[in-house]
Amino acid sequence: MQLIIIYEKRILMIRDMKMTDAEANRLINATSLGYDISIEITKKQMVKLLADVNHHFFFVAEENGLVAGYVHAELYEALYSEPMLNVLALAVDQKHQKKGLGKQLMQKIEFVASELGLIGVRLNSGETRLGAHKFYESIGYTSDKFQKRFLKIIS
């Protein structure tokens, strides 16, 4: 399903992610999120995750035919909460930020959550990403706690 918006001589489209978006996604991850991984790993993860259509949800934003951002959410189910969508990544290329693409991507995820009968959308945002925090608040999200992430690499 596609959403096409024509706004101030810009053609914006929100559509399902596809494998041909791999290089654009890799570049956006590196420049906007700081996760610089290889194209091989990007493609490997996309093959696996795009196939899991009942658990992972991916959409890209195109501006004038070029991938300018994406959102990735997963079904979040726990014993202590009703099901929601959990946004794992929202990334918009730096030169396309502040043009409404992130808002459109989040609205798409909210629509999917509603269509699935879920109670809402949740996400985590890094402590230092103050601009992102301001953005999420501007579109109706509230911060309900602060956390630390613990990580142990085992391989």
Explain the meaning of each model-derived region:
Residues 1-20:
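Conserved N-terminal entry element of GNAT/NAT acetyltransferase domains
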Residues 3, 148-155:
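Terminal substrate-recognition subdomain of acyl/acetyltransferases
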Residues 16-19, 27-83, 88, 108, ...:
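Acetyl-CoA-dependent GNAT
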Residues 17, 90-92, 125:
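Hydrophobic adenine-recognition pocket in adenosine-nucleotide-binding enzymes
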Residues 92, 98-111, 138:
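Conserved acetyl-CoA-binding loop-helix of GNAT-fold acetyltransferases
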Residues 103, 115, 127-146:
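Conserved active-site alpha-helix within GNAT-family acetyltransferase domains
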Residues 106, 113-124:
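Conserved GNAT acetyl-CoA-binding A-motif
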Residues 122-132, 151-154:
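Conserved beta-strand-loop-alpha-helix junction that forms the acyl-donor binding cleft
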